Amino acid sequence: MPSGVSLTPGEAVLGREFTDPARSLDDLAALARIRSSLVARVRSGLAGGAWTGAGESHWLVVPELRALVQSRPAFGIGFFGQVREHVDHGPILDLEQDLVARAPLFPGLLAYYNVRFADRQWGNLVLFAAQHDAGRVRSDPTHLEALARTADHYHSVRLHRLRFRDGAVGGAPPAFESTLLVDFSETPAWRAVRPGLG
């Protein structure tokens, strides 16, 4: 199967287990938990911070609480990576820290929520006021350097695009628009896009 392929909803790719739609459903369930935790933090008045619980490590950055609460609709990206074992992840974590430390400088960035799950895999939810706001982060030199290092730290990744019509902390569930699938087991990396379920 060539790079840059378009898949149909629900389609998996033989030999690439991470493309199994069941994995995306697991991701969406995890994102729902992450969002519920975000809502609980906002309602408690705590918003950002770092904490642990149930074997998980949470790190939440909210540049401006009012914008997070009031922005409607909102756009989100959910990231799930199949991390490489026996690798020093310090370099890419340092880049992440540097990028997120400048979160208030990125217009439209509502929240950055990173979770290390009990199984030692990573997931995060990044929320924006609008889809085009994500481009400002994507084009940042630090983010570009992190992208260049991704293959050293992950076997594969799934990036889910989400639309929150009722806002990031509203009551309505998000619309699942699409998933970008990237496999770093070959060079150049194999990529595919699969539509979501609306």
Give short role names for the model-derived ranges.
Residues P107, D119-Q121, Y154:
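Coil-to-beta-strand transition motifs
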